[in-house]
């Protein structure tokens, strides 16, 4: 193995991996036909492939197991064809628990090469945990939509738990003014729910139980108030790609789209738009923001 991060390389060596000092040394140390499996960020894949491919021979195999855009897979596969290097895209799901549970593998590439690699896929995945989804790009296309769905599920849990967290609104001191719709029947909202306990009970036999909910419950167990988090949610690209595919296919995907937009909102990207809204309300009706002078 080779990693540009000395810390990551040291950890892998301690687990029994054999290390190489450079990409050239890595490729040279492999038995023929050589197989190199990449696990790098999407932005680094092209440069990494160019480096590795310069040392590979016809008949060698290059597997991208990261979260690449499937359109890039189509291009890379064509670029490697003149060198007769086989390219396989593998969407890998399982997160940090994959080492214990096995990884879900969504595979794209030539049938004969995927068949040749089956012993590796079988070793990495749980039973029935890998699938040859189709030709080049198919694996990462399926993984892209998988991650889009993940965004939607996560948003649904977060919104539902937020409703529960706010179910004691009648106990809060809120001013009465012309700019805020009054809460009718405040006595209907006097519940102090224990969110960590609710996530725990939902895990057990509930229709909405899932591994994501298990992880949510674990997070609340470690930090019931989630004080370690500011709520600025990143997005690594797959959600955006899923929405683009939905638009190109003219397929409605309102839940997945809203979940991506909410991540933008969490990072303050709607602040200017909200100021514009407040300014318009003030101009047409003299409406001031709550707390403003």
Q: Model regions: which residues?
A:
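Rossmann-like NAD(P)-binding element
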Residues: 4-7, 11-75, 81, 85, ...
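Residue-level recognition of alpha-helix initiation/capping sites
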Residues: 3-4, 71, 155, 237
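Residue-level "edge-of-site" marker
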Residues: 5, 25, 93, 259-260
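Metal- and O2-centered redox machinery and metal/ROS homeostasis
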Residues: 15, 74, 231, 251, ...
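Short glycine-/small-residue-rich flexible loop motifs, especially phosphate/cofactor-binding loops
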Residues: 9-10, 77, 161, 243
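Rossmann-fold dinucleotide-binding core
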Residues: 48, 63, 69-170, 292
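Helical "substrate-binding/catalytic lid" subdomain
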Residues: 106, 116, 137-287
